[in-house]
Amino acid sequence: MXKAVAVLTGSEGVXGTIFFTQ
């Protein structure tokens, strides 16, 4: 799940990194 969220928000970059850490 986390990975999926990181990829989806990867467009923003910053949000993707934060979600990936969570």
Curated annotation (Swiss-Prot):
Is-annotated flag, keyword Oxidoreductase? yes
Q: Which organism is it from?
A: Hordeum vulgare (Barley)
Single GO cellular component term: cytoplasm
Tell me what reaction this enzyme catalyses: 2 superoxide + 2 H(+) = H2O2 + O2
Its annotated function is as follows: Destroys radicals which are normally produced within the cells and which are toxic to biological systems.
> Where does the record say this protein resides?
Cytoplasm
**EC number(s) per UniProt?**
1.15.1.1
Indicate what this protein is called per its UniProt record.
Superoxide dismutase [Cu-Zn]
Q: Which residues form a coiled coil?
A: none
Instruction: Note how many cofactor molecules are bound and how.
Output: Binds 1 copper ion per subunit.
Record keywords: Antioxidant, Copper, Cytoplasm, Metal-binding, Oxidoreductase, Zinc
